[in-house]
């Protein structure tokens, strides 16, 4: 917070900007075995080789929409930290109610 006291909103002395690593191609971190395990949990026995890239694309678009909504809730509340409730409300807005995380 660099010397702004509790709840340091407003302009004032900003801290030094840290260098952020540019994130790219992280979707490949969802590995083939991880997708296979999820499919097994869903009752799938055999998996085509073409499925993996398709699953990554669908998962990426789903997460982008949920995260976009969650960040919108966070910004509206004038916070910088996305809470679990923001994600719960974002999922509820998309018709996928999630129980067990409050709200």
From Swiss-Prot:
Stored CDD domains: HFD_H4
Question: In the UniProt record, does the keyword DNA-binding occur?
Answer: yes
The leader peptide range reads: none
Kindly give the Pfam families that the UniProt entry links to this protein. Answer: CENP-T_C
Positions of region (Disordered): 1-20
| Compositionally biased intervals (Gly residues) | 1-14
Q: Which residues does the record list as N6-glutaryllysine (modified residue)?
A: 92
Q: How is it modified after translation?
A: Glutarylation at Lys-92 (H4K91glu) destabilizes nucleosomes by promoting dissociation of the H2A-H2B dimers from nucleosomes.
Q: Where in the cell is it found?
A: Nucleus; Chromosome
The record's listing under PANTHER family reads:
HISTONE H4
Q: What does this protein do?
A: Core component of nucleosome. Nucleosomes wrap and compact DNA into chromatin, limiting DNA accessibility to the cellular machineries which require DNA as a template. Histones thereby play a central role in transcription regulation, DNA repair, DNA replication and chromosomal stability. DNA accessibility is regulated via a complex set of post-translational modifications of histones, also called histone code, and nucleosome remodeling.
Name listed for the protein in its UniProt record:
Histone H4
Give the originating organism.
Answer: Candida glabrata (strain ATCC 2001 / BCRC 20586 / JCM 3761 / NBRC 0622 / NRRL Y-65 / CBS 138) (Yeast)
**Quick one: which gene encodes this?**
HHF1
